[in-house]
Amino acid sequence: MSRTIFCTFLNKEADGLDFQLYPGELGKRIFNEISKEAWGQWMAKQTMLINEKKLNTMNPDDRKLLEQEMVRFLFEGHDVHIDGYTPPEK
């Protein structure tokens, strides 16, 4: 049975993550406040960031950038900006 949480990103009740995906205090916050749906949206943005900016997840500076962008996206309401990308019209 899945857990239900209040997702602070989506501003609604939603299925929570099955387990903590990120280490430390930030990981606990993500586990408690971010839904599967919101995490999936972040994963898509993260993939775009890695590909477009040619980031290497083995590089500590690149990992730090990804973490900063993740916090901005999930908790501060900022969208990920990628040069030259225009989101599709809804």
Swiss-Prot record:
Among its keywords, does the record have Transcription? no
Instruction: Report the GO terms under cellular component.
Output: cytosol
Keywords assigned by UniProt, alphabetized: Iron
Q: Which domain of life is it from?
A: Bacteria
The processes (GO biological process) annotated in the record are:
cellular response to oxidative stress
Single GO term (MF)? iron ion binding
Question: Is Iron one of the keywords?
Answer: yes
Function recorded in the entry: Could be a mediator in iron transactions between iron acquisition and iron-requiring processes, such as synthesis and/or repair of Fe-S clusters in biosynthetic enzymes.
Question: Assembly and interactions?
Answer: Monomer.
UniProt lists the family membership as follows: Belongs to the Fe(2+)-trafficking protein family.
Protein name, as recorded: Probable Fe(2+)-trafficking protein
Specify the species.
Answer: Proteus mirabilis (strain HI4320)
**Lineage of producing organism:** Bacteria, Pseudomonadati, Pseudomonadota, Gammaproteobacteria, Enterobacterales
